[in-house]
Amino acid sequence: MTYEYILVRYGEMTTKGKNRSKFVSTLKDNVKFKLKKFPNIKIDATHDRMYIQLNGEDHEAVSERLKDVFGIHKFNLAMKVPSELEDIKKGALAAFLQVKGDVKTFKITVHRSYKHFPMRTMELLPEIGGHILENTEDITVDVHNPDVNVRVEIRSGYSYIMCDERMGAGGLPVGVGGKVMVLLSGGIDSPVAAYLTMKRGVSVEAVHFHSPPFTSERAKQKVIDLAQELTKYCKRVTLHLVPFTEVQKTINKEIPSSYSMTVMRRMMMRITERIAEERNALAITTGESLGQVASQTLDSMHTINEVTNYPVIRPLITMDKLEIIKIAEEIGTYDISIRPYEDCCTVFTPASPATKPKREKANRFEAKYDFTPLIDEAVANKETMVLQTVEVVAEEEKFEELF
């Protein structure tokens, strides 16, 4: 007897009201996309739960893809048996025996959705538990802190048996919360900010500023690799590569060095806002953490925010560096981020940047030079690419080869 189903629990989505069907539909669509490489799978999404019928597909491979889908709280590997006592007992034992690791204790949990089942819950517990005890060695019951919880859901005609419970990514399905533009620098912080934004159900497009020849092709590839890594958590990431050399050279020449960092960030915001308007995005996300560097003080953020009417989302604002690194390691972006290639933020770095820049001064310095043509040129010459999960791209290429 093998696992035939995966039962998915929604978590936070269950708090939604009239628009819950939209959340469920989006999650189902995202799951179907992530499981494209498993053609035999069938998915049924109800108001409270999602049922994935494996039809012979490898449950471990499917589980590995499911764990990165936002909107899933937990999921269980399940066996489906007839709602007859002997079948339930055999199924419970089979599921228990498939649990890996050092198992010494267990308990039985029974949920009778089908109230006409001839036995009550308190009668079923010793029957099922006793069958497991009779057919195993050195195993005891522990109802308070068991190594394994054998869950039985009894329905009309059939029952689900579950032992293996796994955590999902949590959050909300990507796509239910609109779209934002993420400033993706290539450092540790901004990919984590993108990940946390997606976790709230928001689609992301990334904007990266590069300044050749001061930044290398390897630095550019590093950002492409980061965007590629983020596709594990969504359908695709659109990456906009913005040429920033002329803007930076002009800032370095025309703006006092203490304000060059502030003005550079303001130019980035202006350009990103223009791209956001083109792409129908509703906000801008950055990887700023309060007080981490000179451009991330409250005074700096206040001055930088002046140039955009878009909401600026800062998911990392109260995190320290170790907290951010921990998430980066967990999501697979850390090793890419620490590749030793410079980005445009490290080019022309001033010796003493202003930590409390004033809006009035920034505006006065910028007024001495017309940056509008440079902004227009940067937006017009951006390079845009769409990145998808490697497995999905491979499947699509394989399909195209048939024609």
Swiss-Prot record:
Similarity-based family: Belongs to the ThiI family.
Catalytic activity: [ThiI sulfur-carrier protein]-S-sulfanyl-L-cysteine + a uridine in tRNA + 2 reduced [2Fe-2S]-[ferredoxin] + ATP + H(+) = [ThiI sulfur-carrier protein]-L-cysteine + a 4-thiouridine in tRNA + 2 oxidized [2Fe-2S]-[ferredoxin] + AMP + diphosphate; [ThiS sulfur-carrier protein]-C-terminal Gly-Gly-AMP + S-sulfanyl-L-cysteinyl-[cysteine desulfurase] + AH2 = [ThiS sulfur-carrier protein]-C-terminal-Gly-aminoethanethioate + L-cysteinyl-[cysteine desulfurase] + A + AMP + 2 H(+)
Keywords assigned: ATP-binding, Cytoplasm, Nucleotide-binding, RNA-binding, Thiamine biosynthesis, Transferase, tRNA-binding
TM ranges: none
Gene this chain is encoded by: thiI
GO cellular component, one term: cytosol
Record-listed E.C. numbers: 2.8.1.4
GO molecular function: ATP binding; CCA tRNA nucleotidyltransferase activity; tRNA binding; tRNA-uracil-4 sulfurtransferase activity
SMART domains in UniProt: THUMP
Residue numbers binding ATP: L183, L184, H208, F209, R265, G287, Q296
Function: Catalyzes the ATP-dependent transfer of a sulfur to tRNA to produce 4-thiouridine in position 8 of tRNAs, which functions as a near-UV photosensor. Also catalyzes the transfer of sulfur to the sulfur carrier protein ThiS, forming ThiS-thiocarboxylate. This is a step in the synthesis of thiazole, in the thiamine biosynthesis pathway. The sulfur is donated as persulfide by IscS.
GO biological process: thiamine biosynthetic process; thiamine diphosphate biosynthetic process; thiazole biosynthetic process; tRNA 4-thiouridine biosynthesis
Pathway: Cofactor biosynthesis; thiamine diphosphate biosynthesis
CDD domains per UniProt: PPase_ThiI (cd01712), THUMP_ThiI (cd11716)
Name by which UniProt lists this protein: Probable tRNA sulfurtransferase
Cellular compartments annotated: Cytoplasm
Name of the top EC class for this enzyme: transferase
Species name: Bacillus anthracis
Domain THUMP, first and last residues per copy: 60-165
